[in-house]
UniProtKB/Swiss-Prot annotation:
Residues 177-189 are annotated as: Connecting peptide. The keyword Transcription regulation does not apply. Pfam families: C1-set (PF07654), MHC_II_alpha (PF00993). This is H-2 class II histocompatibility antigen, A-U alpha chain. Disulfide bonds join C105-C161. PROSITE patterns: IG_LIKE, IG_MHC. Residues 216-227 are cytoplasmic. Belongs to the MHC class II family. The gene is H2-Aa.
Length: 227
């Protein structure tokens, strides 16, 4: 079975924040950009198969904002409980120095859905090569979000995903740097070479013994028996 879902997310504090998304089997197909007032497809191929009028999403957002205002007044403007989000950073592909790759910052347990995610390279903010998804709804009605950073791994660079949210007392930094095998020390190299030489010598000695035994066996079998 396949599941398609669409929905709106609206939050006020104090400005209006919202989004309209459409998902299929848990994957986002498109969202409506509220500033540009246009439909943004996650893959260009999707736009060739179907279309969606962004005005429909904008109308739903307007309705959601109105309903939220009514509910806020009825609750005497009681604020929502802020949850502390959790972040994880990992590469999209196995890391090879000098080969282009993508870092992914996965932020889960977001509530309310208002968050700042920033990439840092060597403690400096990075803007180029950054892409961020809209919010995805979890089963418990919290949210998760992904931020991507295209980069070229180098042993001189370290990266951090900086997460800022009302549920955190201070920004959280999730650190990542390429894992480069430590070079062998001179002592280790000497031991490895000595072991390799020893194994080689043992092989030569054992081989020589087998050859001698084979020659002796062959010589014995060639002696003629009694007439």
């Amino acid at each position: 079975d396949h599941v398609g879902s669409y929905g709106i997310v609206v939050y006020q504090s104090p400005g209006d924040i919202g989004q309209y998304t459409f998902e299929f089997d848990g994957d986002e197909l498109f969202y409506v950009d509220l500033d540009k007032k246009e439909t943004i497809w996650m893959l260009p191929e999707f736009a060739q198969l179907r279309s969606f009028d962004p005005q429909g999403g904008l109308q739903n957002i307007a309705t959601g904002k109105h309903n939220l205002g009514v509910l806020t007044k009825r609750s005497n403007s009681t604020p929502a409980t802020n949850e502390a989000p959790q972040a994880t950073v990992f590469p999209k592909s196995p890391v090879l120095l000098g080969q282009p790759n993508t870092l992914i910052c996965f932020v889960d347990n977001i509530f309310p859905p208002v968050i700042n995610i920033t990439w840092l390279r060597n403690s400096k903010s990075v803007a180029d090569g950054v892409y961020e998804t809209s919010f995805f709804v979890n089963r418990d009605y919290s949210f998760h979000k992904l931020s991507y950073l295209t980069f070229i791994p180098s042993d001189d660079d370290i990266y951090d995903c900086k997460v800022e949210h009302w549920g955190l007392e201070e920004p959280v930094l999730k650190h990542w740097e390429p894992e480069i095998p430590a070079p062998m020390s001179e002592l280790t190299e000497t031991v490895v070479c000595a072991l390799g030489l020893s194994v080689g010598l043992v092989g030569i000695v054992v081989g020589t013994i087998f050859i001698i035994q084979g020659l002796r066996s062959g010589g014995t079998s060639r002696h003629p028996g009694p007439l």
